Amino acid sequence: MKRFLTFDELKSLTYEKIEALQNQKFRAFIRYQIYPNHPFYRRLFKEHEVDPFDLKTPADWAKYGLPLVKKADYKGNLREFVLNPQQVDGQDRNPAEVIRNLLDYYKEAGYKDERSFVFRRGLKVKLRVGKEKATQELLDHIKYQYSPRFFWFSSGRASGLPSPVFLTHYDNELMLNNMAKSGKMAIDPFVKDGFELRAMNLFPSAPHLGFFGVDGGLLQMADFVVRSTAGGAISTDKLVQLAELFKVTGFAAMPGYLRNIFCQELVKQKPKLEKRGIILLAGERIYDAVVDNIKDYFAEVGMTETRVIGGWAASETKIGVACQCQEKGGYHNLSPLAFAIRFVKFTDSVGGYEFTSPEEGGYITIFHLDGRSSMFEGYLMGDHVDRVTTGKCPHCGLDMPCFFNISRESEIGAQMQVMGIAEEKIKGATVNLTVLRESLLALSDIHEAQIIVSKSKPDDPYSMDVLSLNIVLKSNTNQTKAQRTIQKLTKMETEITPEIHFMDLDTLLEQAGGLKFQEIVDARVKPS
C-alpha cells in the first residue's frame, strides 16, 4: 500500500480501485490509530456504543448512528483531537502496547516496509540484541510520526486566539507530496510543449495552510520559485517588478488579492511577461467573472495564453487538497489516500443527516485516512457543493468524483446549525464572527456591538471585503483608547484591521432591526 499516489498513478486507477484503497485505509486508521490514540473519538464511540471494528467504510458513520463532528466541537476540545499513543483514557500506556498497535496498523493498512522496520527493532529489544540502538530507532520513529512540530491556524475561538491545527514531520511529508499534485494538475496540458514553471507565491506569509501548502507544493514541482508573499515586506509594485525580472510563468494567490491589488499594479506598470502562464487560485470562492477579469489583466501585459485553476483545502484537511482540472470546472480530490470526501444533507434541525447521491451535492464532510497529530473523522466542513459527477472525467481522464460550485453557507442561522459557529471568509481569512462578537462584548468599555461584512465597492461583488464594527460604548469611556483596544483585539483574532463606527444605542438599534437585533450581517452583494 502506498501512502500517496503520484499524479500519473492517480490517472491510471479506476474509482473502484481508489475507493477500495480508501476503505482499507479507513478500517486500519479507525481501528489502530483513531480508537486507541484519539481521546475525542474514543469517547464518542463509547458514548454511542459503536465498536470501531464495525466501521468498514465512511458510509458506516451514518449506519451506526454516529453524529457529524462540527467545528464548534473541535474548538472546544483542541487537545483531545491530537493523536497520543502514549496515553489511553488519561493513563500512561505500556510502551509494548504502543508498538503492538503500530504493528497492527501497518499490517492492516498494508505498509509492509514500515511494519518490517518496527517488528525487527522490537524483536532486537526483546532479545536484547543491539537493544540500545534498536530502542533509539523506535523512539525516533514514533517521534517522527506523532510529535507535533508546528501548526497553522483555523479561525478564532473563545480564548481570543485562533485555533491551531497541529502537524508532525510525518504530516509535513504527506502534505508536501499531495500539494504538489495540484500544481501538476494545472501545468499538465502545457508539459508536452516543454513548459517551464517559474512560480511566484503571492499568498500572505502567515501560519495558514494557504501559505505553507502552496509554498511547499511549488518547491516540490516548480523549476524556480519566487517566495515573495503578498502584503508583506515587499510592496506590490516591487512584486510586479520581480515577476518581470525572474520571468515568472506561474502565480499562486487568493483571487481577491490578485484581481484587486496585484493586477491593478500589473496593468499600471505594464511589464513584459511570458506569453504562456499558469494561475493557481485558492482561499476564497472563485467566481467565473473574476477568472475572466484576471485573464484579461494578464493578457494586457503579454501573457495571452493563461490557464487559471482553483484549489480547495482547509486548515482541517491538513495533508490533502482538491483541485480543478480545467478553468471554471469541478474539483477532484487529488489526495484520496490522505482523506475521503463525502457529501451529506440534513434531515432535521437537531443534527440528523444522511449521505447524498451524487446528483444532489451536499455539505462536504471529510474522513482522514492517514496523518498524525490533529485528526478529523466525520467532520463537517461547512462548505456546500451544488452537484457531483462520477465516472472518468472527459477533461483530465481521472476516474473519480468531480464536485462543482463550492460555497460557504452564508445565512448566519443556517451556519449555526451546520457548524455550531458563524464563520465567513474575509480577505481570504476564515473569521469566526460569533467569537469575535463575544470577545468585543467582553471588553469592559463596550455596551453593544454589531458586525457587518461588506464590499469596498458596494456594486462590485468581486471587490475587496470590508469588516465593519458598529460599536456602542459605555458612558464616560475614552473613545480613542477604546478604538485602539478594539483594533488590537480584532486584528489578533481575525488578522484583519476593521472599520470602526461609534454610535449611540438608539441609532444602532434602528440600523440593526430593532427588537430583532441583527448581531452579524453579511451585506456583500452576491454575483448575479
List the model feature ranges, each with a label:
Residues 175-198, 235-247:
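Conserved ATP-dependent adenylate/AMP-binding module captured primarily in the ANL superfamily
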Residues 135-140, 160-169, 196-203, 226-227, ...:
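Short acidic, glycine/Ser/Thr-rich loop/turn "cap" segments at secondary-structure junctions
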Residues 1-154, 160-181, 245, 465-470, ...:
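Nucleotide 5′-phosphate-binding alpha/beta core
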Residues 137-142, 204-205, 238-240, 265-268:
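Catalytic micro-motifs at enzyme active sites that drive phosphoryl/nucleotidyl and oxygen chemistry
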Residues 172, 204-208, 256:
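Short glycine-enriched loops at secondary-structure junctions
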Residues 97, 102-103, 203, 228-229, ...:
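Glycine- and other small-residue-rich loops at beta-strand/loop junctions that grip anionic moieties
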Residues 1-40, 198, 223-528:
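Active-site glycine/GP-rich loop and adjacent strand/helix microenvironment
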Residues 182-221:
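Conserved AMP-binding loop of ANL adenylate-forming enzymes
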